[in-house]
């Protein structure tokens, strides 16, 4: 398993652990970081060097990628949403599951 794959799995493990501890905020953070790892690998394999290492910036970058499906761009949009004053998402989505889907789909597109 390569370094980025280990980091990706670690973030998803941490997200599940945070969720088990009823820490939804930390689970969202881990989901975003996992997405950032997959996006960096996706862009690197396409020969694109992102200008920022931030997962949030990378998610914003792919939200407008015309080569990605509308579903994946919507997931990127969800992963960049701000929580309300009650620390809730303004939409009813499972960001960990959505991040997994985004990662899986991006990595399928770059698999040899």
Show which residues each predicted segment covers.
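Charged alpha-helical initiation segments
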Residues: 1-23
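Generic structural signal for well-ordered, non-membrane alpha-helices
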Residues: 6-13, 33-37, 74-77, 101
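Short, charged, amphipathic alpha-helical segments
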Residues: 25-32, 93, 97
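Hydrophobic alpha-helical packing segments in soluble, helical-rich domains
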Residues: 27-45
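Long, charged low-complexity segments
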Residues: 43-44, 48-112
């Amino acid at each position: 398993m390569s370094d980025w794959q280990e980091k990706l799995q670690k973030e998803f493990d941490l997200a599940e652990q945070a969720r088990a501890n009823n820490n939804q905020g930390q689970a969202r953070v881990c989901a975003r970081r996992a997405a950032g790892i997959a996006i960096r690998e996706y862009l690197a394999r396409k020969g694109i060097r992102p200008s920022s290492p931030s997962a949030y910036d990378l998610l914003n970058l792919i939200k407008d990628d015309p080569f990605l499906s509308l579903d994946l761009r919507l997931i990127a949009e969800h992963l960049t949403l701000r929580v309300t004053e009650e620390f809730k998402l303004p939409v009813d989505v499972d960001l960990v599951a959505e991040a997994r889907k985004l990662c899986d789909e991006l990595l399928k597109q770059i698999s040899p």
